[in-house]
Design a protein with these regions (language model features):
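PLD/PLD-like phosphodiesterase catalytic module centered on the HKD motif
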Residues: 1-174
Length: 174
């Protein structure tokens, strides 16, 4: 087991070293950002597939009745994080968003499958790359990869390298 503190060693650096041609990546997280894709673009181009589960209902048709909407919190923030979270504003202002979005969309069509947790059950975020497991992972963003600080006092991620551990998490996708 390894502890990644996202200061001295980042999840991004570890993923750059750990993702190889033919790797299979599975992610359960609250959001997906094109800027996180950009940080790992070279490595992600070589993978066989990415399976992603949004841990909260995202990009799904709402079925809530009008009476339940009295305390409704809009899901727009989860879905808009696709184009960057509040901590990725600096990158967004480089006017490269359209190009990154097109590259990411093309990659998603070729390599990725996205699903959403539509149950009322909580899901913990995690990521597996072949036999390595990273947990907890909140979102697939530059903050979670350790590229940006965000508003976290700390963001420690545990990495385990065991077929049994990774297989347990991978089975959650089936």
């Amino acid at each position: 087991m390894q502890i990644i503190d996202n200061i001295n060693k980042t999840v991004k650096d570890d993923l750059k070293a750990g993702i190889h041609k033919g790797s299979k990546v599975s992610v359960a997280a609250a959001c997906f950002s094109i800027y996180a894709y950009q940080e790992l673009k070279k490595q992600l181009e070589g993978i066989d597939e990415l399976r992603f589960i949004f841990t909260s209902p995202t990009f799904v048709t709402e079925k809530a009745s009008k009476a339940q909407r009295e305390f409704y919190i809009p899901r727009i923030s989860r879905e808009s994080s696709l184009y960057g979270t509040e901590f990725e504003v600096k990158l967004r202002n480089e006017l490269t968003q359209k190009a990154i979005a097109k590259e990411c969309a093309d990659w998603i069509k070729r390599k990725a499958v996205f699903k959403s947790n539509v149950t009322q059950e909580q899901m913990m975020g995690f990521m597996t790359v072949d036999e390595s497991t990273y947990a907890p992972i909140s979102g697939f963003t530059t903050v979670d990869l350790g590229c940006e600080r965000g508003n976290n006092a700390y963001y420690t991620v545990m990495k385990t390298e065991s077929f049994e551990n990774a297989n347990h998490y991978i089975k959650l996708f089936e």
